[in-house]
Amino acid sequence: MKRIVCIICAAVFALTARAEIRLPAFFADGMVLQQQATVRIWGTAAAGAKVTLTAGWDNRTYTCKAASNGSWALKVKTPAAGGPYEIRISDGEEIVLRDVQLGEVWICSGQSNMEMPVKGFLSQPVEGAFEMILDAGKDNVRAFTVARRLSDTPQADCGGKWVAASAGTVPDISSVAYLFACRLHRTLKVPVGIVVAAWGGFWGGFLPGKLRKRFQKRSAPGYWR
C-alpha cells in the first residue's frame, strides 16, 4: 500500500514539476501581428527551460531561457504583410499557432461609444448594421475583444479570442473599430487586426492606480455640457 502511495505521489510530482508553455490569450490561432516590425512574444514555462520559437514566414528560430519565475519573452522580426503562417513554440513540448496573419494591428479603446457593437445596444440600433453584416467577410479583418474583468492589480493576461470577420462574428464587434478596420483594409490592402478594449462608463479602470487617485476628488466645473 505504501509503495502504491509513493508511486502516485511521484507521478503527481513529475506532472507538476514540468510546467508546460503557456501563452496569453492574445497569442493564438488566427491572430494578426504587426508587419515590418520587431514584435514581442511572451509567456511562461518551467523555470530555466529553454524556449524556442520558429516563425513560419522565414523559418528563423529564436531562443531564450525562462526566468526563475517561469517568464520568458522573445523579440521576433516580421516582414511585409502576408499569411497565413504558423508559429512553433517549444520547450520540448511544442505549441503550434496556426493561421497567423501579418498586417496592421490597432488598439481600439474607450467607453460606450467604442464598446457599442455592430448589433447595437438594447433600443439603440446602429445605422447601417444590416449592410455591414451582409458584407462581412469581404474584408480581411480580425478582431480580439478583451473580456470584461475586474482586478485590483495589473494582470499578465486577459480573456478574449481572435475572430475573423463574418456574418456570425461581426454583430458582436465594436462598430467604430470594425468600420475603421474595414476602411484601413480597403486602403492598404493588407490584413487588419483590431484589439478592442472598451468598457462603458469605466474610464478609471484604464488608468494606473496612482494616477487614478489624482482624479477621484476632482469635480466638474459649474458649467459643462
Q: Model-flagged regions — what are they?
A:
Residues C9-R18:
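Hydrophobic h-region of N-terminal signal peptides that target proteins for export
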Residues E20-R225:
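Cell-envelope and extracellular/periplasmic
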Residues K2-I8:
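Sec-dependent signal peptide recognition
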